[in-house]
Every structure is written in C-alpha cells, then in structure tokens.
Amino acid sequence: MSSLKEVKNRISSVKSTRQITSAMKMVASAKLHKAQGRIENMLPYQRKLNEILTNFLRTDASFESPYTEKRPVKRVAVVAFSSNSSLCGAFNSNVAKMLERALEDYQSLGKENILIYPVGRKVEEAVKKMGYVPQGSYQVMADKPSYVEAYELAEKLMHEFVEKQIDHVELIYHHFKSMGSQVLLRENYLPIDLTQVAQEAAEDVPEDARSFNNDYIVEPSVGELIAELLPKVLSQKIFTVLLDSNTSEHAARMLAMQTATDNANELIQDLTKQYNKSRQQAITNELLDIIGGSLK
C-alpha cells in the first residue's frame, strides 16, 4: 500500500490537473458559443442565396457551367480541415484517418497527381508524415475563420479546376450537428452537382417561404445570373465548412475537457478513500503497538 505522503501528493497533483481541465472547458465553451453565433449570423445569407439559385435552376434546368464539367479524373485535390491544437478527443485523428482512406482511393494516380490542401496544423503534420507535400499552409484560417481567406482558397480551387489543372476536388471536415454530435464528412466540391445543390437548397428554405411568389424578371438572362451565383455558392461553401469545422473543434474540446474533469473527480474520490484507509490503518497499527508495549 502506498505511503500517506505519496497518496496525498497524488491527490494534490490530480486536483491541479482538474483545475486546468475545468478552465480549458470554460474557454472552449466561450469559443463554442462565439462560433455558433457566427454560423447563425451566416445562415440567413446562405439560405437566401440557395433559395434564389434553386428558383433559377428550376427555370433553366439545362444550364451548363465550367464548374459542372465532369471529366476523367487524372489529377485530384483534397481539402482537409482540422484544428491547430490537440486536447479535443479524436477530432484530429479521425480527419487524418479519413484523409488516408481518401488518398488510398486515388493511389493509382500517383502522389504527383494528388494535391492536398491542409487547413489546420494537425492535418498538415499528418500530410507530411504520409509523404505528401502540402499545397500551402492554412493554420491561421483554422484558428480564426475568415471569409476573405476562405474566398481566396475557393478562388484558387475554382481556377485550377476551370484551367483543367485538377479534375476533381473533395472536402473532408466535421459537420456540427449539436453539442455532442459532430459528423465527419467527405464531400465532392468540384465538379458541382447542380441537382444536389438544388435539392439541398430546397431543404434549407423555410416552410413559410416556399409558397412565396418568386416569378422574377431577370436581365440579361437566367443563365448569366446563375453563372454569377455559382462562384458565390462555391466560395460560401468553403466558408461554411470552415465555420463548421471550427465549431466542431470547440465542441469536441469542451466534451473532452468535461470527460477529463469527471475522470479527475472520480480519481480524487478513489484516492481520498485510499488515503483515509491508509491513515486508519496507520492509526490502528500505532494503537496496537502502544497496547502491546503496555502489556509487556
């Protein structure tokens, strides 16, 4: 059995750790609420943009764009979103595992034809360990989501796709559903599937807005307006994914720190019982020694 001093020191150490995890949970909670607020502020714009696009796609279902062109995949780009720091459970390791599976799917293309855009330090480190060269560093964007930086990344991807430098683009990120649920997704980004966009956009439109009269007079043409809207939708998608990933990170860290704090509380209880038991045994032994000595 451990000495009283050892158990007491361990209790003190665990209590100090509990203070750290509890403080980190509070910080993560504050950041989570801020991130949720950013998503809520962005949603009205996204919904309206999707609503307008859906209505125009119904008008011109045969619309074609450089962003919709499907061709044989000879060169692919994968954009993976993670965090810059750890202590958020399996958040980063799950992204790395899904990225590894995606790279295995495109292994036949050769490493030189697989471009990886890592958003976040953890996934950037994972990419280097896998033997790939990251296509830039986006660590600042992972910590502080910025529409300007998201727009620049989207512009780069769209330009490379239109110029046929890449034939397919995928996104790997966590979608924030609730405090306890962050779903890891692997989605196609380019070429864009207009049918799927219209379907998702229709689901995002509130029920009371679906019956609204959307018989717009369009100048110069529906096709030209859709052509203007698509880059905005694609840029908005990258920003939405960035906010999603950032919010999911804070939720995962908050949950991890809550679990760590709960585990620390349980360990303190067990160690306190052990300390009391050891102390009781020590007192009993002293009493027995005293009683035994008095009987001699």
What is each stretch, according to the model?
Residues 1-296:
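C-terminal beta-strand-loop-alpha-helix "lid" module of Rossmann-like NAD(P)-dependent dehydrogenases
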